[in-house]
């Protein structure tokens, strides 16, 4: 029986099985965290008026709030611009969700950057509850990108 120094008495076979299990767990965790892109897209559609019911007290997009506040002096194109920007936001979140589920770490980083920038706009609009919802998504996407980073690093420890 051959043992490895890193496995605390485990054989090569046991070590490989444990490593395969760790990799499977990390992949499952990253896919689970990528599903939050779809939740965010649904909440964004709910908060921006793309759905028949609008609930912008609990969920909102800071950039669209600023556009609504300062963009009212536009011409009759204003409602179309608001719906177009909201639809682009939702489509972007859906695309990031599919990319994240396929194991692309950049999707998580882009989502964190997108929502981090939007959190600045939310602070300007004094939407603290929505800021907390955004922070939750940023945290979940950070966990997803970290799982993919650990998955790509063969010597990473799970401790």
Feature-to-residue mapping (PLM):
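Topology signature of small-to-medium multi-pass alpha-helical membrane proteins
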Residues: 2-159
């Amino acid at each position: 029986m051959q043992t490895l120094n890193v496995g605390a008495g485990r054989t090569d076979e046991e070590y490989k099985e444990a490593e395969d299990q760790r990799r499977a767990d990390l992949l499952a965790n990253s896919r689970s965290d990528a599903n939050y892109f779809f939740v965010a897209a649904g909440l964004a559609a709910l908060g921006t008026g793309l759905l028949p019911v609008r609930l912008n007290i609990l969920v909102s997009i800071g950039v669209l709030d600023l556009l609504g506040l300062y963009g009212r002096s536009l011409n009759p194109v204003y409602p179309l611009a608001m719906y177009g920007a909201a639809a682009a936001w939702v489509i972007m979140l859906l695309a990031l969700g599919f990319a994240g589920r396929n194991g692309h770490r950049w999707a998580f980083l882009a989502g964190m950057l997108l929502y981090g920038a939007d959190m600045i706009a939310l602070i300007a609009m004094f939407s603290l509850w929505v800021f907390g919802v955004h922070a939750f998504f940023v945290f979940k996407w950070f966990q997803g990108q970290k799982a993919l980073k650990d998955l790509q690093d063969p010597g990473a420890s799970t401790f």
